[in-house]
UniProtKB/Swiss-Prot annotation:
The lineage of its organism: Eukaryota, Metazoa, Chordata, Craniata, Vertebrata. One of its GO terms (cellular component) is Z disc. One of its GO terms (molecular function) is muscle alpha-actinin binding. The gene is PDLIM7. It comes from Homo sapiens. It is found in: Cytoplasm; Cytoplasm, Cytoskeleton. Binds via its LIM zinc-binding 3 domain (LIM 3) to endocytic codes of INSR, but not with those of IGF1R, LDLR, TFRC, or EGFR. Interacts with various PKC isoforms through the LIM zinc-binding domains. Binds to RET in a phosphorylation-independent manner via its LIM zinc-binding domain 2 (LIM 2). Probably part of a complex with SHC and the RET dimer. Interacts with TPM2. Interacts with TBX4 and TBX5. This is PDZ and LIM domain protein 7. The LIM zinc-binding 2 (LIM 2) domain interacts with TBX4.
Length: 457
């Protein structure tokens, strides 16, 4: 591992992205670089571990704390980085082997560990193992690229039941990493690169057959690889696997009961029912209900005991009214509580008209002239009788003698010469001067001022 320090001159952006942190139990590292950015120009590489940020140890920082620390560095960012040395294979001297190298054959159901672990006999004591023939090239020549492939594993699309890398790290910390996802194992097997071993040179020396690899310890292999009956024991049709499925009721509620104001209960009742193991009790007779029942006003009833308080009619179907704790059918409610008409003194059971602080039948509150129901239109009262607007203007409307237009309510007017005038219409017929409150003369029912009293009109 090579440790070095990089100083980036601000301002942001710095041209790199972090991953990991104390909260992920993974050291902080560079996961992405912007091509041509400040970090790339300073020699930072993908996969470099971040040891310090602005002089502070990065090992104790969470991912968010590290981001905030970098944002706080305005004009100058100092990073302490560590880079792994690339793994290079060194060619070894070719020598005739004493025996053929062991060939490993893995059954399709055997799970491989994520990190390569030797099976069988331990490696020789020499730290540099001898190779025969052409040296094998490593699958990932750079350790930083290997870390990048592992760190970006969570970004690839995964099946719905696959485990993420963060979950596997947690499993490693809790000691449950051997429980590997079957879907993930299948994907790993399909993506493995087949490795071809160099053929060993023929040897004239007779060799004994290789006994095979030593079976690994049970703790390093998943249970479905060790136990051949694992798949059968945990099949979905076994009792150990519970499938929860939402089930619809066998018989739907009848449409007639749905549209009724009083509905037949399909589930439980307030305060008790099939949902909590209680039996419904009739609110009228206080007896346990066996069979069909009704729910109304928060209580359960026998269908034959939900009746009108006045006439005793069963209210199983149709509407009802509740007044002062008593239940009434619509006819009884209208007779008992419906208002009376101010004209005919009968109960109003249908459409009602409110006018003059009284209630009326619609057909009783009509115009005194045309006998048309007034309903929501404007009306005028004359001698205690209502008139529609059209008939009132025709019969009682006042017109100005000067302009021949109607004098509306609220208009200023005066009466002179036996006629009604708008205050602005009572003017001299010749000079048009206003004569309100002044002496005037009259000729041919037209007012004249003093100056034109003897003029011809």
């Amino acid at each position: 591992m090579d440790s070095f320090k990089v100083v980036l001159e601000g301002p942001a952006p710095w041209g790199f992205r972090l991953q990991g942190g104390k909260d992920f139990n993974v050291p902080l590292s560079i996961s992405r670089l912007t091509p041509g950015g400040k970090a790339a120009q300073a020699g930072v590489a993908v996969g470099d571990w971040v040891l310090s940020i602005d002089g502070e140890n990065a090992g104790s920082l969470t991912h968010i704390e590290a981001q905030n620390k970098i944002r706080a560095c305005g004009e100058r960012l100092s990073l302490g980085l560590s880079r792994a040395q690339p793994v290079q294979s060194k060619p070894q001297k070719a020598s005739a082997p004493a025996a053929d190298p062991p060939r490993y054959t893995f059954a399709p159901s055997v799970s491989l560990n994520k990190t390569a672990r030797p099976f069988g006999a331990p490696p020789p004591a020499d730290s540099a193992p001898q190779q025969n023939g052409q040296p094998l090239r490593p699958l990932v020549p750079d350790a930083s690229k290997q870390r990048l492939m592992e760190n970006t594993e969570d970004w690839r699309p995964r099946p719905g039941t696959g485990q993420s890398r963060s979950f596997r790290i947690l499993a490693h910390l809790t000691g449950t990493e051997f429980m590997q996802d079957p879907d993930e194992e299948h994907l790993k097997k399909s993506s493995q690169v087949p490795r071809t071993e160099a053929p060993a040179p023929a040897s004239s020396t007779p060799q004994e057959p290789w006994p095979g690899p030593t079976a690994p310890s049970p703790t390093s292999r998943p249970p479905w690889a060790v136990d051949p009956a694992f798949a059968e024991r945990y099949a979905p049709d076994k009792t150990s696997t519970v499938l929860t499925r939402h089930s619809q009721p066998a018989t739907p509620t009848p449409l007639q009961s749905r549209t009724s104001i009083v509905q037949a209960a399909a589930g439980g009742v307030p305060g008790g029912g099939s949902n909590n193991g209680k039996t419904p009790v009739c609110h009228q007779c206080h007896k346990v209900i066996r069979g069909r029942y009704l729910v109304a006003l928060g209580h359960a009833y026998h269908p034959e005991e939900f009746v009108c308080s006045q006439c005793g009619k069963v209210l199983e179907e149709g509407g009802f009214f509740e007044e002062k704790g008593a239940i009434f059918c619509p006819p009884c409610y209208d007779v008992r509580y419906a208002p009376s008409c101010a004209k005919c003194k009968k109960k109003i059971t249908g459409e009602i008209m409110h006018a003059l602080k009284m209630t009326w039948h619609v057909h009783c509150f009509t115009c005194a002239a045309c006998k048309t129901p007034i309903r929501n239109r404007a009306f005028y009262m004359e001698e205690g009788v209502p008139y529609c607007e059209r008939d009132y203007e025709k019969m009682f409307g006042t017109k100005c003698h000067g302009c021949d237009f109607k004098i509306d309510a609220g208009d200023r007017f005066l009466e002179a010469l036996g006629f009604s005038w708008h205050d602005t219409c009572f003017v001299c017929a010749i000079c048009q001067i206003n004569l309100e409150g002044k002496t005037f003369y009259s000729k041919k029912d037209r007012p004249l001022c003093k100056s034109h009293a003897f003029s011809h009109v």
